[in-house]
Amino acid sequence: MGKEEEEWFKRGAEVEVSFNEQGFRGSWYTGTVLRTVSKKNNKIFIEFHTLKADDKKASKPLRQFVDLVDVRPLAPRELSRSFNLSDLVDAFHNDGWWEGTVTDVIHHHHHNSNNSTSSSTYSVFFRSSREQIEFHESDLRLHREWDHGNWKPQLEPQLSQPPTSPSPPPPPPQQAPPARDN
C-alpha cells in the first residue's frame, strides 16, 4: 500500500466498496475500515454500513476482507444539486449506490397559503438490471470515478460539502524579496 492509500484507508476511514459479482456490478457500498493489511495480500477488513451478515443474527453488519483495488474513499456529495437528462448518476437503491442515467426530470410545484415551493424527482435507468426507477434529488449524486487519488469529474468547490477533517490553514502570503541595488 502506498503512503496516500495508507492515509485514505487507515483504520476508522469511511470507504466505499464495489463487488465484481453478478447482481452487484456497478454498485458501491459504504463501510468503515477495521483493519489495514500488509502489502503482500492487498486486502483490508471492512465493516459495511448497510449490508448485513448472512447468518441467523441478520442485524449484525457484514464484516469481511476485500481487495484493495475494489475500495475507494467515500464519494463526495454536493450540498445541493439538480440533474439534467442524460446525466450519469449514482442512485441510492437496495442498500448501495448504483450507476445509472437520468432519463426524465419530473418537476413538482407545491402551493399553500403562505408560499410556493418546487422540487424535482428523476427517473433513472440502470443498464446493469435494465430497470427504470424514480428518485428524489437527495438519493442521487453525480457519478464519479476514483482515479489515482483524484475524483473525476472534479467537485465544483462552491457546491461541495466541507471535508470531514479540517483542512490546514492556507500558508501565509509570501513577501517579495527585497529590491537589490545594481
Model-based region annotation:
Residues 1-182:
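Eukaryotic chromatin- and chromosome-associated nuclear factors
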